[in-house]
């Protein structure tokens, strides 16, 4: 770590990357980023290549026109249109070929030179310019290429000495390279920045009055990290250290520091610029210090540009700006983790939590007040270390999760762009449909030739079709399509429902299981059930027909766009998996193929969810077919009980099958046989063969691509209720599904409960389970505030303020604002002036204090809790324990109430011994018959229907917050008995 002037820093990085070099015809380069300049009609491609073991960067330009589409509103009374528009079939519910097809007249116009109004009215305004380039040219971000002729790079720019590059002569100038022919990949240069802000020590930092103390920047290139810290301090400071790759530049003017930081990007020249929550905090704060101005970012000798901003709305309605850096890829990594459901296994999305989980590393331990005090005393070394570590960790996370491969795979496979990195799956599918609609082909049934058959994907139709606003028309009638006569419908069309019906989503079939412990159950699951259904029934928006009889029908056109896409994705994934598995020497190619096959799977599986958003009629029919297939599978499986062929093959006198549990596309099957007929030492092997035989027999009864696969032989299975179970799988590993996994349960309770349940799974012994539970719960009580971290004992709740939006037709609520636990804790954090104030979508860790008041009033942010001066309330912890003890009672039954009660009482006594306001005792009470679980009545179903969309939205929001997925319907047509007639309840001491 050494202090340098900004001029010295510039000089040190002047040769950071070669500026002048030769590129031969054999040198492969990779397009990292593209930018289209609409003012001059020029595409700028930023590229990286390897020269003599060193990364070299350059750019080239291509003169080209870029096109968008707008609707033509001419009357079209003549044969030709003065606007030279083209007529396309509409993508959504176009009609019936050779009868009537709804058309949309579209003008293709040049974006370069067009007015702002034209661009704002474009039908493809949801796309970035980079998406358009990907769809209209062979230049795609992430593509490997070669020059057809040897070139010379001068001042980081490659220009052909003979003539400028032009799109019309692309094949003469460039060759696209198949990555399968390569042995190593070309990586982007990575950078990450972070700011530290000053405060008075009592309140949160405010850009109106609090300066930026420093801006850290880490750059990764050629496997080497360089770290730079831009520091603002009015007085002279000294910093010790001898790290040659850490540079500290001290400014006595804050504005100069900010300007120099952004100017330095031209020297470091990263392809990807990361931050963590930068869209919400860092960048708006910097703008605040610049009096609202956006900073300028330049690259090479190109003119510096201000970042663009675009509104980003999360799935729970939170709204923030996303910053796009034009010449650079900018990614707020916090948004990626917040948007990706696959990352829900972490406790929260704080940088320290993610770093510990994925990297086994932590931030520098420095609280905010101490940092400000050290800054005031000119002790900057620790602050700089803290700042730079926060810059290193996001880069390491990005690379650990191989997000570069993910980002560029999306570009190559679906014409997304690097600016779409945090886009939701809906945007991915809409962009894919837009491109496929324009380039669609079909095979002529008469000639057998492949002919062009374009459609136009108008995204506005999706909004009209799915809107729930009150009005004179509802449902799909908003599309205003001409109704097709009933006599002209294709004979095999499927009726989906009424055109003007407002449809609520219906989930898959779920059988309510009887709680218990089962041995040797096995799972038999459908392979990609909903994907197979969509192919089988030809589910596509182009196949929708609005009929004169008032109903929506689904045509069975197997050449529909989505059907072709799904078949392509299935084939593509199969081929990519084979390519991946054949890579024994190249880690680069293995990772590339693995990322691409995962993306194929994710896209195919998400199309059903896409229909669930925009066309619930179609989604509900898909779900209905899924329920029918699961019901049929259950009948087939149980119908194999005491099958003569199976009995003979395995030399058994009896072999019955009972489906214990079914959920959407999977079944849990319990085989019953005489234990003495299968030797214990070969039991698992024999049962595996029986499972495989059942799979073969069931698949022989299905047609049209429906297949089931034997997934797991579970030596022990514990079923609690729907979507809540655990088991020991075929690899002898314990798996928990939906039970003891939620983030709103403290870590120590999760650990104690899971450890206890493992005793049942491993030993089928309830007493060992209770002994383990008692030992661990008492141990964690004694370790509170001493040897165990406080985070193990905390709860967390997501903070949402003003989520969603109020439409013009809706009146704003006048009722008093509800103070949630999260809001209450956030206000405490604000008043105390902590270093991190949670924003919308953040989970806030908290505990309850043992004070008088409601649960909300007791809630206190964990960040401020001091166990030496504050007394924790165990009220909520014991409520969770009460639920767990009742679950054990439900599994094991009334005959074990005494043992359960003894264990429960011992734990409760320990935790209640010092409580002043929240002291509880446990009582065993009789369950009323009306309380018992029963099949939903018709009244209940009607009540759900009357609840309407708002209730469903609330249910989904709760589901997102708690990692639940209980929207699916429950099929309780069979009476399910219960093991217990008693339950535990907590009561206050009188």
Swiss-Prot record:
GO MF annotations, alphabetized: DNA binding; DNA-directed DNA polymerase activity; nucleotide binding
Gene name per UniProt: POL
Enzyme Commission no: 2.7.7.7
One GO BP: viral DNA genome replication
Organism: Choristoneura fumiferana nuclear polyhedrosis virus
Chain spans, region Disordered: 936-976
Keyword DNA-binding set for record: yes
UniProt keyword Nucleotidyltransferase present: yes
Highest rank taxon of the organism: Viruses
Catalytic activity: DNA(n) + a 2'-deoxyribonucleoside 5'-triphosphate = DNA(n+1) + diphosphate
UniProt biased composition (Acidic residues): 960-972
Name of the protein described by the UniProt record: DNA polymerase
Name of a matching Pfam family: DNA_pol_B_exo1
Similarity section: Belongs to the DNA polymerase type-B family.
Keyword line: DNA replication, DNA-binding, DNA-directed DNA polymerase, Nucleotidyltransferase, Transferase, Viral DNA replication
Function: Replicates the viral genome, host DNA polymerases cannot substitute for the viral enzyme in this process.
């Amino acid at each position: 770590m050494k202090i340098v002037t900004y001029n010295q820093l510039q000089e040190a990085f002047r040769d950071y990357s070669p500026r002048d070099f030769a590129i031969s015809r054999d040198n492969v380069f990779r397009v990292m980023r593209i930018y289209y300049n609409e003012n001059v009609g020029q595409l700028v491609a930023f590229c990286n290549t390897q020269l003599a073991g060193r990364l070299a960067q350059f750019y080239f330009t291509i003169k080209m026109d870029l096109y968008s589409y707008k609707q033509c509103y001419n009357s079209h009374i003549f044969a030709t249109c003065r606007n030279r528009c083209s007529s396309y079939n509409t993508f959504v519910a176009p009609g019936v070929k050779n009868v009537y097809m709804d058309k949309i007249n579209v003008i293709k116009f040049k974006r370069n030179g067009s007015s702002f109004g034209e661009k704002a009215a474009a039908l493809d305004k949801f796309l970035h310019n980079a998406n358009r380039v990907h769809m209209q040219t062979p230049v795609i971000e992430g593509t490997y290429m070669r020059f057809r002729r040897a070139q010379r790079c001068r001042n980081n720019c490659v220009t052909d000495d003979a003539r400028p590059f032009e799109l019309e002569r692309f094949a003469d100038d460039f060759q696209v390279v198949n990555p399968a022919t390569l042995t190593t990949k070309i990586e982007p240069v990575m950078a990450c920045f972070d700011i530290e802000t000053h405060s008075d020590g009592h309140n949160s930092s405010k850009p109106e009055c609090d300066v930026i103390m420093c801006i850290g920047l880490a750059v990764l290139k050629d496997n080497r990290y360089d770290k730079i810290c831009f520091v603002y301090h009015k007085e002279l400071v000294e910093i010790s250290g001898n790290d040659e790759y850490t540079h500290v530049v001290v400014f006595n003017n804050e504005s100069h520091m900010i300007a120099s930081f952004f100017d330095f990007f031209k020297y470091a020249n990263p392809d990807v610029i990361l931050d963590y929550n930068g869209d919400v905090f860092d960048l708006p704060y910097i703008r605040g210090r610049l009096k609202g101005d956006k900073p300028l970012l330049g690259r090479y000798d190109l003119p510096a540009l201000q970042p663009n901003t675009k509104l980003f709305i999360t799935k729970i309605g939170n709204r923030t700006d996303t910053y796009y850096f034009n010449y650079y890829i900018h990614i707020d990594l916090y948004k990626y983790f917040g948007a990706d459901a696959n990352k829900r296994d972490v406790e929260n999305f704080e940088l320290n939590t993610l770093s510990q989980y994925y990297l086994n590393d932590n931030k520098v331990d420095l609280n905010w007040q101490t940092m400000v005090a050290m800054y005031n005393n000119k002790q900057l070394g620790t602050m700089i270390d803290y700042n730079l570590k926060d810059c290193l960790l996001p880069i390491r996370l990005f690379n650990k999760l191989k997000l570069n491969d993910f980002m560029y795979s999306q570009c190559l496979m679906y014409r997304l762009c690097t600016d779409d990195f945090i886009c939701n799956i809906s945007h991915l599918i809409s962009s894919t449909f837009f491109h496929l609609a324009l380039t669609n082909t079909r095979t002529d049934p008469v000639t057998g030739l492949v002919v062009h058959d374009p459609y136009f994907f108008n995204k506005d139709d999706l909004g009209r079709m799915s809107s729930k606003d009150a009005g004179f028309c509802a449902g799909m009638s908003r599309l205003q399509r001409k109704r097709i006569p009933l006599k002209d419908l294709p004979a095999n069309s499927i009726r989906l429902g009424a055109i003007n019906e407002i449809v609520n989503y219906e989930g898959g079939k779920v059988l309510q299981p009887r709680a218990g412990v089962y041995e040797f159950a096995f799972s038999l699951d459908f392979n990609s059930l909903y994907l197979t259904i969509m192919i089988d029934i030809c589910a596509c928006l182009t196949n929708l027909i609005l009929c004169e009889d008032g109903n929506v029908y689904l045509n069975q056109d197997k050449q529909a766009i989505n059907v072709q896409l799904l078949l392509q994705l299935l084939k593509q994934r199969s081929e990519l998996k084979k390519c991946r598995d054949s890579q024994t020497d190249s880690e680069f190619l293995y990772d590339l193929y693995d990322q691409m096959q995962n993306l194929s799977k994710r896209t195919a599986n998400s199309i059903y969810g896409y229909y669930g958003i925009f066309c619930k009629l179609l989604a509900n029919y898909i779900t209905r077919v899924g329920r029918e297939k699961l019901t049929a599978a259950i009948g087939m499986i149980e119908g194999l009980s005491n099958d003569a062929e199976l009995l003979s093959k395995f030399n058994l006198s009896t072999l019955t099958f009972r489906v214990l549990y079914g959920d959407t596309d999977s079944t849990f099957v319990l085989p019953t046989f005489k234990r003495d007929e299968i030797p214990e030492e070969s039991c698992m092997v024999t049962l595996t063969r029986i499972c495989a035989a059942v799979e073969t027999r069931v698949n022989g009864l299905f047609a049209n691509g429906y297949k089931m696969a034997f997934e797991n032989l579970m030596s022990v299975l514990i079923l609690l209720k729907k979507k809540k179970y655990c088991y020991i799988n075929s690899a002898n590993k314990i798996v928990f599904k939906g039970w003891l996994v939620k983030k709103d349960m403290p870590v120590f309770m999760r650990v104690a409960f899971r450890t206890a349940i493992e005793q049942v799974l491993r030993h089928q012994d309830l007493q060992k389970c209770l002994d383990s539970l008692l030992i661990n719960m008492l141990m964690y009580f004694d370790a509170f505030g001493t040897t165990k971290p406080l985070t193990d004992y905390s709860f967390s709740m997501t903070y949402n303020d003003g989520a969603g939006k109020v439409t013009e037709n809706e009146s704003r609520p006048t009722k008093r604002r509800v103070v949630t636990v999260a809001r209450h804790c956030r206000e405490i954090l604000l008043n105390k002036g902590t270093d991190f104030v949670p924003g919308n979508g953040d989970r806030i860790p908290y505990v309850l204090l043992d004070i008088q008041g409601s649960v909300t009033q007791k809630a206190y942010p964990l960040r401020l809790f001091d166990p030496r001066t504050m007394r924790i309330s165990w009220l909520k912890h014991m409520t969770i324990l009460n639920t767990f003890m009742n679950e054990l009672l439900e599994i094991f039954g009334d005959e074990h109430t005494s043992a359960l009660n003894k264990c429960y009482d011992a734990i409760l006594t320990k935790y209640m011994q010092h409580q002043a306001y929240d002291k509880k005792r446990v009582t065993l009470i009789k369950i009323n018959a009306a309380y018992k679980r029963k099949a939903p009545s018709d009244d209940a179903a009607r009540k759900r229907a009357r609840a309407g969309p708002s209730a469903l939205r609330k249910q989904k929001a709760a589901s997102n917050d708690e990692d639940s997925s209980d929207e699916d319907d429950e099929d309780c047509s069979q009476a399910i008995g219960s093991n217990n007639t008693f339950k535990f309840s907590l009561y206050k001491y009188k």
